[in-house]
């Protein structure tokens, strides 16, 4: 079992192939990532989810920028992201980001509508600063993705890294800024077999507490709560309630 703690101490991670040799997207499009900022990403899967482990080397780890923010707000932080297209058709990416302060962001991206950050999936991640850089570990359940029912999967895949203090962005599969969009220039993930698209049902409970004070200095509180429901009707439509 993989524990999402950012330690990468499970032996199974060592058996996974390594994605490396990232290429700069901005500002010097096409330039190789410096050796002292090299990035290594591994992917594993089981019957329920896909797992991502990223080691982002940095020769000055004390300078890694991190800011605690709300969900879907990157703030002033280094970022790691994974882009997944379960149909490998260049049409729609599911993008998952973790910043160096351990914050999450996610969105659905299409060429037509751009990035939609109102979409929120349920997934796990952990970011840890180390003496060599920083680590991100992620567990993305299949319920957060779209993919075919084929026994052998071929997914579009890319990884993203931003080094905020240097204003530099890198991707694993080269994104030529003179050509199409991110969704049309992904790499390919093969080897995932015998998984089935699950029922896409998320239940998201929430609560809030309000404190009120009137002119007579009387203070009282109000507790509110509720439940958001997201249900995948089919590959194209999701019901939000």
Task: Please provide the spans of the model-predicted regions.
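Structural preference for beta-rich elements and adjacent junctions enriched in aromatics
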Residues: 1-240
């Amino acid at each position: 079992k993989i524990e999402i703690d950012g330690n990468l101490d499970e032996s199974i991670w060592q058996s996974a192939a390594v994605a490396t040799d990232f290429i700069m997207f901005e500002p010097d499009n096409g330039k190789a990532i410096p050796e002292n900022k090299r990035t290594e990403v591994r992917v594993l899967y089981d019957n329920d989810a896909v797992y991502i482990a990223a080691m982002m080397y940095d020769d000055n780890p004390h300078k890694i920028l991190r800011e605690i923010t709300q969900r879907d707000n990157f703030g002033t932080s280094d970022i790691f992201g994974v882009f997944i297209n379960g149909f490998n058709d260049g049409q729609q990416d599911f993008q998952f980001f973790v910043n160096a302060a351990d914050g999450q962001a996610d969105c659905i991206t299409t060429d037509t509508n751009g990035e939609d950050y109102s979409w929120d999936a349920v997934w796990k991640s952990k970011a840890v600063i180390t003496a060599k850089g920083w680590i991100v570990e992620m567990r993305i359940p299949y319920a957060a993705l779209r993919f075919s029912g084929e026994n052998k999967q071929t997914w579009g895949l890319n990884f993203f890294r931003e080094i905020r203090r240097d204003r530099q962005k890198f991707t694993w599969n080269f994104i030529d800024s003179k050509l199409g969009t991110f969704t049309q220039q992904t790499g390919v993930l093969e080897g995932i077999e015998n998984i089935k698209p699950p029922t896409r049902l998320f239940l998201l409970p929430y609560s809030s507490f309000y404190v009120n004070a009137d002119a007579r200095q009387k203070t009282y509180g109000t507790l509110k709560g509720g439940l958001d429901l997201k249900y995948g009707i089919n590959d194209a439509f999701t019901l939000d309630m």
